[in-house]
Amino acid sequence: AEEMGATTKFTASDSAEAMNYMAMAGWKTEDMLDGITGIMQLAAAANEDLGTTSDIVTDALTAFGLKASDSGHFADVLAQASANANTNVSMLGESFKYVAPVAGAMKYSVEDVSLALGLMANASIKAEVAGTSLKTALANMAKPTKQMQAYMDKYGISLTNADGSMKTFREVIDNLRSGLGGLSK
C-alpha cells in the first residue's frame, strides 16, 4: 500500500482501503497484486474513490465468476460503458450490485450487462433502479409464471436455444425487440 501511495495519485491510505475490500472479497495477496492495477486505472480515469471502485470491481468479479486477473478487463468495460452512456462508474457499480448475482448465475457476460445498463441509463434509468429492474426482468423471464410463459410463447420470446443452452444476453434483447417490436401502446 505504501509503494502504491508513493507511485500513484492515490495515498497509501487509499491503497490500503482498496486492499481491504479485496481481502473482504477473499482475495489472497497474489490476487490483490493481479487486480490492483486495473482497479487503480479505473478509479483514476473515472475520478472515483479507490476504495469504492475496489468494492465495485471485487463484488462484480465474484458475481460473474471472474478472477482477480480479470479486473483490468472489467475496468475497461466499465470505463467504456460510462464514457458511452449517460452514467458514471459509481452509478454502474450500484447497478451491478443488484443485477450481477442474477446475470452471473445465468452466465451472461459483463459486456452484455454493461451494454444493457448503458442503454437503460440513456433512458434515465440508473444506479440501483437499473440494477433492480434488470435483475427482476431476468429472474422473471428465467422462471416465468404460467401467464408470462403464455405471452412469451405467443410473442416468440425465449431465454434458451433449441438445445436448452442459454441464449446470450444480446440474443435475448434481439428476441425481445423482434417479438415485441410491433406492439402498439
Describe every region a protein language model picked out.
Residues 1-73, 80-92, 103-111, 123-131, ...:
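A short, structural motif
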Residues 111-118:
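EAAAR-patterned alpha-helical heptad-repeat segments
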Residues 134:
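Conserved catalytic-loop aspartate of Hanks-type protein kinases
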